[in-house]
Swiss-Prot record:
GO terms for cellular component: extracellular region. Transmembrane segments: none annotated. GO terms for biological process: defense response to Gram-negative bacterium; defense response to Gram-positive bacterium; hemolysis in another organism. InterPro entries: Antimicrobial_frog_1, Frog_antimicrobial_propeptide. Residues 1-22 form the signal peptide. Expressed by the skin glands. This is Brevinin-1CDYa. Disulfide bonds join C61-C67. Its main location: secreted. Belongs to the frog skin active peptide (FSAP) family. Brevinin subfamily. Antimicrobial peptide. Has low activity against the Gram-positive bacterium S.aureus (MIC=12.5 uM) and the Gram-negative bacterium E.coli (MIC=25 uM). Has weak hemolytic activity against human erythrocytes. It comes from Rana dybowskii.
């Protein structure tokens, strides 16, 4: 009976450590996702700006009909 209690206590202890490590890893992953979202926003802004600049000459050509 005593060895059963020891093994159950050991399993509980190891499980608790495992859960705390998983929680820390999950928190780190969430922080990375937040950083990735900010980087994606910057990339989208850059793409949008480059597309707008590329479309300007075509727009002037259509409006003023001087190509």
């Amino acid at each position: 009976m005593f060895t059963l209690k020891k093994s159950l206590l050991l399993i509980f202890f190891l499980g608790t450590i495992n859960l705390s490590l998983c929680e820390e890893e999950r928190n780190a992953d969430e922080e990375e996702r937040r950083d990735d979202l900010e980087e994606r926003d910057v990339e989208v802004e850059k793409r949008l700006l480059s597309l707008a600049l590329a479309a300007l000459p075509k727009l002037f050509c259509l409006i003023f009909k001087k190509c």
